[in-house]
Amino acid sequence: MGDYHEFTDQYKVPVIAKLLHALPHYNITFHKINSTFRPNDEIYLESLGILGSVPAALLIVSLLGLLFYLMTRCCDRKPRPAHSITSLKVALSIVTVMCCAAIGLGLYGNDDLHNGLLEVLTAGRKVDNLVTTIRNQTHILENTLTNRIRPQLVELADIFDQPVSNQTALSKLFVSLNIVQGNVTLATNAASDIRRPLMGISMTHFLTRGDQWELIRWPGTVATLALLLVLCAVLLVGVARHSRCALILFSVCGLLAVTGSWLMSGLYLSSSVAVGDLCISPADFLVSTAPRDLPTNVLLHYTQCEPGHTNPFTQRLRESQNSLNNARSAMATVMKISLVLFKSSGLQPKLGAVNADLNSSERLLTQLTALVDCKAVHHNFLAAARGLCEGGLLGLVLMLIASFIAAILLTIMVWVDSHTWIYIRKRNDYAQVDEPSYISHPAPQNHQQMMNAARTLPRNHNGHFSPPVISGSHTLQHPSKRQQHEMMAHAHIQQNMRAMGTHTLGRLPSHNHSPTHMTGPNNAAAVAAAANAAANMPPTTQAAQQQQQQQAQQQQQQAQQQLGGPQPIYCHHPHQHPHPHPHQHPHSHSAAAVAAAVQHQHAIYHQQQAQQYGTYTTAAHHAPHHLGPGQSQIYQQIPAHLAPQLAANGNPHSIYQPLVAVSQGSIYVSNMATMRRQNSQGGPQIPAHQHPPSLHQQQQQPPPPSQQQQQLHQLKSPQQHQQQLQQHQQQQQQQHHQQQHHQQQHQQQQQQHHQQQQPNESDVVPISTAMDTAIYDRDKQIYKCSTLRQGGKFDPKYKPSILNCPLPEIPKDAEQPKVESIYEQRQQAHHQNYSKTLQRPPMMLPPQMKAIPPPRIGTPTSPPPPVAQPLNESNGGVPSGLQNGGAVVGGGGANANEDTSLPPPPLEAQTEATKARMGAGPAANGKVLHNGGGGGSVGGGGGGAVDDDDDLPPPPPAITDESNYAVTEL
């Protein structure tokens, strides 16, 4: 069994070692040399260096290739178009994963090499310990035989020199003592022979250095491969996150990784070939490195340990053992004879010590015989050889393959990475810009621009009015593509808000204006001029003009009714008299003339708009109705084909597009401000269809307080203001009686015509204050949110209740108004070609000329006026009208398709004749009609005169009240 184990437990050369050993070994002159492992031979080391230079050559080639590629990229200054780097990123990711796998393989090979080297070192330590033990045992045996037994034998010989009677026994005693001494010498020589060759064997230095190198190599290799893994991870992160910085970092560090990988490949290749050469015949390497004192046969015996070979130390051990046995036998004879011959000498202890030393020496020889056996040394040799040539060499080869593959992959990765990051644009830094202002327009530079901005609303490209600008909250967003903005939770509140009108910047809740009502300094000047002209005109002329104007209006209304219904879209009404007592004005005829001229301009504009837009019906009331000759239309007129849609779906416009609706070139304007102001000032109520108006209610409502004096105080120079104020106070008492007379006459005529047109009257429905209160609260909240209301700064205390309101631009600079006289406009109106075709309104720039106060109107939410029953046949059946700025307002008629058209331009003679008739006509019914200082006078005349040079432009296509555009003073 032992022979079989000895036979099967032999070293076999691994296949990897054979392959590596088969590699050609060339010197510097490219001559093939012996491939035997000779680490101390320079030629052999030269051949290993040449083999290791192959990866170094590949390193140089790869670096040159990368260098040329980078040079071409650096020299290429052409702008690169947008290029898809998805394929490059995918390829780079795949190569990176493969490189990580190669690095992992290198880590596995490093662990195998580490384990193989540990086995070699462990086996070497065991062999070294065994040799040391044999050497120590032989040394102890030799010391015992030489230093302890031999001196005792010498002492015994001295004792035996004493004379004795039995010479024969004495001679036999000396012979046995000499045999003991001789055998001890033989045993000592045998032990010395065993120890002598082992004295030069010492692997302690080799093992210690091996431990040190392995302690550095293994963690160093792990750290290097881990660093490569980190670089691969950086590359993967850069590819995943499209990071230009990470890719550039890998490009720089990748060059170092490529260099290190190729250098490690060369080192591993040389080491692998060397270990392969060693593993072909490790015993021969041991023989070549064995000390000179160690015989070759001894080393080969221990490395091969063949059963047929004799142990070189066994013979000497056997000789030593035989010598000790002979010495012990002889010592026994000596003890027997000496004890008989020398009884009184005390030899017993000495003889016992010699026997004890001989026995210990024999035991040492027995142990030494077991130590010098080749089985233990051969086992350790096989363990070391297998650990190095099988596990260690395999791990080294794996590291060689891993480093070679990693070097190639890293070279590819660096090239692809360098080709990839040039197509990744650097991320643009965020520009340091100021936060945009939430006010969509800059503040006016001076007071004039502020006033122009306050009087003018922006228009869009179609000439229609754009929504107002409401600033003061940063939550207000710019208009989106949506056509409608649902701002309120309830439909009725939203409808009330839509009926309200637009707001200007910084307006108080009560300052609701229509887009076209541009009252301001220009209007104040026009009012003052009209007052002066009225004061200079005779009463007869004014009465004649007023009478002629009323007749012309009646004729025009009848012609309009015969042609097909109401014509104008925009109805301008005379303003209320600015003074509470019209009877104080004596020169009412002059004011009436001026008012007739102003009303003539409105008539021209109504005719133009009527011929462009045609006849429309009222969306709110479809029942046909008629208007009296002195009445005006206060409802919006909407095309008949859109009225059912609007009635069913409600107003499709948001609250920030109130009163402005464009459909097939038509503009529908509604205003809620007039009703609210009339209600707050105690003005007239809106008549309904089914409630007859009360005469007492009509007469007890006073006109609104005067605003003429306030405008004169604010906008006129001090001298002009004082003169104008004195004239105004002198004329108040004279004009009041005449104006009252003309107003009664005008009211009788309107009631007669209204009784003919409308046989049925309705009761007066008081204006509801619920909707007015909601509108006022909404306006107040908007006013609180205004930035101008807070002194140009946003006040966080006020929470805006309206979101998503559009912020259109307001014209920054107002151009100078174009001067056109009223006579030029009259001439243009006469030469204009009228057309009954429905046309889109002309594109008009924002009004930049002096404006006149258009007439006060009603609101679209009030029902149409009823037809009053005949109160008195003696006065011609004049119905009780509604006082609305001095004119009887007919919010609706009996026929929706029949409307009174505006009168044609009056001639001067006709104007005077009309005013004469109006002055002579008695007030039969005794009703006083307040209309701004004269029956039918427009703009609250009576406080001044209108010059011919003053410009009175046509009003823009919208309906407004007399409220002023206000700019809150900061």
From Swiss-Prot:
Keyword Isomerase applies: no
Compositionally biased spans, kind Basic residues: 572-587
Compositionally biased spans, kind Pro residues: 852-868
Family: Belongs to the tweety family.
Name recorded for this polypeptide: Protein tweety
Molecular functions per Gene Ontology: chloride channel activity; intracellularly calcium-gated chloride channel activity; volume-sensitive chloride channel activity
Subcellular location: Cell membrane
Biological process according to GO: chloride transport; positive regulation of autophagosome maturation
Cytoplasmic side: 69-89, 241-246, 417-970
Cross-referenced InterPro entries: Tweety
Region feature Disordered, mapped onto this chain: 532-587, 677-763, 849-970
Bilayer topology: Multi-pass membrane protein
Positions in the Extracellular compartment: 1-47, 111-219, 268-395
Deletion consequences: Flies lacking tty are viable and fertile. Was named 'tweety' after the cartoon character that cannot fly. Indeed, a mutant involving a genomic region that contain tty leads to flies that cannot fly.
Compositional bias annotation for Gly residues: 883-894, 931-945
Biased composition (Low complexity): 532-571, 689-700, 707-737, 745-759
Highest taxon, organism lineage: Eukaryota
Species in which this protein is naturally found: Drosophila melanogaster
TM region positions: 48-68, 90-110, 220-240, 247-267, 396-416
Keywords: Cell membrane, Chloride, Chloride channel, Glycoprotein, Ion channel, Ion transport, Membrane, Transmembrane, Transmembrane helix, Transport
Cellular component annotations (GO), alphabetically ordered: chloride channel complex; endolysosome membrane; membrane; plasma membrane
